[in-house]
From Swiss-Prot:
It holds the Pfam family Toxin_cobra-type. Disulfide bonds join C24-C42, C35-C59, C63-C74, C75-C80. This is Cytotoxin I-like T-15. The keyword NADP does not apply. It is found in: Secreted; Target cell membrane. The lineage of its organism: Eukaryota, Metazoa, Chordata, Craniata, Vertebrata. Monomer in solution; Homodimer and oligomer in the presence of negatively charged lipids forming a pore with a size ranging between 20 and 30 Angstroms. It comes from Naja atra. GO terms for biological process: killing of cells of another organism. The keyword Hydrolase does not apply. GO terms for molecular function: toxin activity. PROSITE patterns: SNAKE_TOXIN. Keywords: Cardiotoxin, Cytolysis, Disulfide bond, Membrane, Secreted, Signal, Target cell membrane, Target membrane, Toxin.
Length: 81
């Protein structure tokens, strides 16, 4: 009985993925922040005039489309931006 109960608890925790949150870099990559619920992507924003230096980083729910002035790069793993 105890084994069955323990098995059910473990399966519940694995299925619900309790406590998992995405971590994304801030503008300075050394610092990261934990994303709020619903924001499941990390992003980097670049100005099209200089694609080597990101001007903004953080968490986002949907990856924005690029424009003539701004390029976005999105990813979905911890500190991938």
């Amino acid at each position: 009985m105890k084994t069955l109960l323990l098995t059910l608890v473990v399966v519940t925790i694995v299925c619900l993925d309790l406590g998992y949150t995405l971590k994304c870099n801030k503008l300075i990559p050394i610092a990261s922040k934990t994303c709020t619920a619903g924001k499941n992507l990390c992003y980097k924003m670049f100005m099209m005039s200089d694609l080597t230096i990101p001007v903004k980083r953080g968490c986002i729910d949907v990856c924005p489309k690029n424009s003539l002035l701004v390029k976005y790069v999105c990813c979905n793993t911890d500190r991938c931006n």
